[in-house]
């Protein structure tokens, strides 16, 4: 980042940071905007070192201007940043981006007026830029320099790698700067594959040429001596015009920029091809549950560049769909920012969402909620256990504490029988049951159980008389009385 941020130093950097992004806004340009502009230039196959000088900024603006009408918001933002940087290099005091664009427009108009005035005075021979393919030789004649093989190789490589993705259009605009229709046809003919796309491009060029002929009807009658004819649509496309005629139109007084007109037709056809090669609709671009917000924004704007819509519609898509198609975590954050949030604020707020730290924080919150719910369930379950068992002191007889914690004087003797000399655990006092027997009994079975008795093994003798009973012997009555205890002690005088 250090090399990218070293574009401005000292007083220029202070002047850069004082310029506002919008009129009346609070945000101003920072070093990060220079870093972003350098990365964007690399993405468009332009040299980021051009930002270090005012002349380099002029070259960048000349290459970006043809794409401003059909380009995306990123290209416009890049052009605005370069224009502001140009004012800083030229020591032009501006308050915001709007004033910088106005100053650049004034400078460009003055430069254009100077070029036109010099062309009227000197035949437009000394004011032709050496950067264009049409240059002036030693004899003062306008000659054409063919496109270098390096430029053609770069164009073919972009088409092969990108396959008519949205990046192809600004790349074509940069490589075809100042080219003649013959140069543009040479670039199109070097594309070997994608013949279906090239046929679509030819159809678009033919339609635009027919529209040009309709809007510019041919002049009837012979031309005056020394006057060149007006170009037709096929002349602009380079099919019925020679290279010398194209040079004459482009360097005439007034000039007819047949190269720029043909270039606009080609860019219009490339926009249709890009839309065909990008079948994914902007409505289908959604953020994954674990996808970083920055990657989602990159995919969103890449698909938005291929949309054939006006800037107002694209602005609505950015304000609405970018938030609507985000994942739930980012959507919650973006809705909290409000409607007027900028893209920079959105990316700053959603930074880290989906990463390890965010996952750990979400997991910790989920675990804390789960533990709280479990504790609530345990408390609810404990409410169904009923009242606790009260404890009673054996020393004072009161409830609520144990004998070892009792503050009353120590009770002497056994806590059961009250006698001294032994403890309750060693007390021999036994409690009688409801039958009057000491419990537990030391002999035989308990008294409330049926006692053992001798049962005869043979049936009793049957009486031969009628209605006679055998009287029991006194000995047997005494035995039965001993087997069953008396209940007089329990029931009083009952028989």
Swiss-Prot record:
This is Gag polyprotein. Late-budding domains (L domains) are short sequence motifs essential for viral particle budding. They recruit proteins of the host ESCRT machinery (Endosomal Sorting Complex Required for Transport) or ESCRT-associated proteins. p6-gag contains two L domains: a PTAP/PSAP motif, which interacts with the UEV domain of TSG101 and a LYPX(n)L motif which interacts with PDCD6IP/AIP1. A motif (PTAP/PSAP motif) lies at residues 456-459. Residues 277-363 are annotated as: Dimerization/Multimerization of capsid protein p24. The gene is gag. A motif (LYPX(n)L motif) lies at residues 483-490. The keyword Lipid metabolism does not apply. One of its GO terms (molecular function) is zinc ion binding. GO terms for cellular component: host cell nucleus; host cell plasma membrane; host multivesicular body; membrane; viral nucleocapsid; virion membrane. It comes from Human immunodeficiency virus type 1 group M subtype G (isolate SE6165) (HIV-1). Residues 217-225 are annotated as: PPIA/CYPA-binding loop. The modification Asymmetric dimethylarginine is found at residues 388, 410. One of its GO terms (biological process) is viral translational frameshifting. Residues 73-77 are annotated as: Interaction with membrane phosphatidylinositol 4,5-bisphosphate.
């Amino acid at each position: 980042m250090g090399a990218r941020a070293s574009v401005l130093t000292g007083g220029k950097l202070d002047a850069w940071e004082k310029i506002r992004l919008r009129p009346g806004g609070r945000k101003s340009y920072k070093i990060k905007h220079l870093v972003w502009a350098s990365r964007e230039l690399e993405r468009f196959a332009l040299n980021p070192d051009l930002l270090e000088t005012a002349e380099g900024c002029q070259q960048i603006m000349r290459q970006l201007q043809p794409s401003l009408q059909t380009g995306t918001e990123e290209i416009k933002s890049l052009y605005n940043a370069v224009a502001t940087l140009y004012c800083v290099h030229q020591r032009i005091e501006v308050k915001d981006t709007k004033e910088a664009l106005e100053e650049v427009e004034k400078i460009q108009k003055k430069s254009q007026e100077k070029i036109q005035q010099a062309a009227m005075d000197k035949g437009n021979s000394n004011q032709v830029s050496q950067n264009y393919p049409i240059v002036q030789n030693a004899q003062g004649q306008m000659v054409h320099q063919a496109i270098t093989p390096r430029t053609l190789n770069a164009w073919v490589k972009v088409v092969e790698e990108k396959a008519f993705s949205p990046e192809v259009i600004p790349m074509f605009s940069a490589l075809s700067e100042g080219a003649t229709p013959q140069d543009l046809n040479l670039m199109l003919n070097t594309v070997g594959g994608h013949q279906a796309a090239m046929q679509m491009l030819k159809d678009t060029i033919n339609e635009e040429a027919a529209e040009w002929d309709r809007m510019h009807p041919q002049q009837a009658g012979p031309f005056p001596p020394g006057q060149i004819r007006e170009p037709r649509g096929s002349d602009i496309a380079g099919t019925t015009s020679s290279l010398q005629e194209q040079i004459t139109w482009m360097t005439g007084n007034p000039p007819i920029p047949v190269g720029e007109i043909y270039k606009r037709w080609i860019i219009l056809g490339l926009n249709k091809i890009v839309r065909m090669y990008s079948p994914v609709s902007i409505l289908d671009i959604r953020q994954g549950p674990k996808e970083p917000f920055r990657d989602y924004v990159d995919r969103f704007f890449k698909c938005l560049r291929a949309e054939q819509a006006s800037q107002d519609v694209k602005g609505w898509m950015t304000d609405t769909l970018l938030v609507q198609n985000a994942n739930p975590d980012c959507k919650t954050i973006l809705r909290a920012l409000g409607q007027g949030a900028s893209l920079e604020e959105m990316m700053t707020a959603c930074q880290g969402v989906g990463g390890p730290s965010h996952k750990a924080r979400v997991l910790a919150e989920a675990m804390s909620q789960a533990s709280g719910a479990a504790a609530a369930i345990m408390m609810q379950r404990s409410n169904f256990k009923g009242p606790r068992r009260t404890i009673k002191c054996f020393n004072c007889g009161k409830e609520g504490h144990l004998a070892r914690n009792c503050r009353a004087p120590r009770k002497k003797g056994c806590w059961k029988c009250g006698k001294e000399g032994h403890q309750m655990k060693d007390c021999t006092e036994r409690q009688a049951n409801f039958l009057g027997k000491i419990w537990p009994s030391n002999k035989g079975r308990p008294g409330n159980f049926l006692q053992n008795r001798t049962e005869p093994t043979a049936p009793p003798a049957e009486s031969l008389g009628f209605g006679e009973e055998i009287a029991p012997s006194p000995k047997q009555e005494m035995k039965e009385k001993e087997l069953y205890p008396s209940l007089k002690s329990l029931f009083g005088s009952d028989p």
